[in-house]
């Protein structure tokens, strides 16, 4: 997409925030496909859980074709293995190995695009934002460690880290902290618990329980974004990795619908008195009353 700019040539720093959502996070891949087709490039990316995996791949400079290939072939067996532990059913160390083997770079310092992954400190309940330095694969693993299913991940400071979705499932404020002036957020859980039937696995039960606790925080983060995409994936469960093609298409449809709004935000609006771009959200543009 051609970005318009004022006579200084400056453009807003564009950020992308990707939510967690287990298999539903594959919808992020479809959105990236449309962004890639339009030549849209992000200056910084933040992701939680599944969003950290997809966002990390994007920030690493991985070609989109490879991201899509991974998204369509990814299975639960790639992410974890059964383990003997009182703290979880599986270890997701395999996910760390998977990422390290496929990403073009392995450390935050080497990423061509600034990136942050969010985890949760199990002892304090605080968000742990991993950025700037350290191991990207480890950060993604920690961000994806669904509590109760995966064993918590212990970092170099002795903190037990679990899925960032507990405290920041849609990390809009995190990508703002990376310097984003315009933020596109993708929330794959907007439709909540609407799906066909009850959870079909322990993972589904755990993820749905997390979603209930996330709703207030996510609603606030949605308000902080300039454009929010909500792919229509509510009829598919969080554990249905085999429906990758449907998740990806849902993400692509949401991105196509959002492209006009994104384009408008990146255009200069001198008549608005804001210089080189218009930050007003479409939902705030109401006709004036007499």
Where are each of the predicted segments found?
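Patatin-like phospholipase
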Residues: 1-48, 56-290
């Amino acid at each position: 997409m051609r970005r318009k700019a004022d006579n200084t040539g400056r453009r807003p720093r564009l950020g992308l925030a990707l939510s967690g959502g287990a298999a539903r996070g594959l919808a992020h891949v479809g959105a990236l496909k449309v962004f890639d087709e339009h030549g849209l490039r992000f200056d910084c990316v933040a992701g939680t859980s599944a969003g950290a995996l997809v966002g990390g791949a994007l920030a690493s400079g991985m070609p989109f074709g490879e991201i899509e290939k991974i998204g369509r072939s990814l299975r639960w067996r790639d992410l974890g293995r059964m383990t003997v532990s009182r703290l979880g059913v599986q270890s997701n160390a395999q996910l760390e190995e998977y990422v390290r083997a496929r990403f073009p770079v392995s450390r935050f310092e080497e990423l061509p695009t600034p990136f942050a992954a969010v985890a949760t400190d199990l002892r304090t309940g605080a968000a742990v934002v991993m950025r700037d330095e350290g191991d990207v694969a480890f950060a993604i693993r920690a961000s994806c460690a669904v509590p109760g299913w995966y064993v918590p991940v212990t970092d170099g400071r002795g903190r037990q880290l679990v899925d960032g979705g507990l405290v920041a499932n849609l990390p809009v404020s995190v990508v703002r902290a990376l310097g984003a002036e315009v933020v596109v957020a993708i929330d794959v859980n907007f439709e909540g618990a609407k799906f066909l039937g009850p959870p079909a696995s322990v993972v589904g039960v755990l993820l749905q329980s997390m979603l209930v606790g996330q709703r207030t925080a996510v609603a606030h983060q949605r308000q902080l974004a300039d454009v929010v995409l909500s792919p229509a994936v509510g009829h598919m469960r969080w554990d249905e990795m085999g429906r990758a093609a449907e998740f990806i298409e849902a993400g692509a449809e949401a991105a196509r619908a959002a492209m006009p709004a994104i384009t408008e935000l990146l255009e200069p609006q001198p008549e608005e008195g804001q210089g080189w771009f218009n930050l007003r959200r479409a939902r705030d543009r109401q006709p004036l009353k007499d």
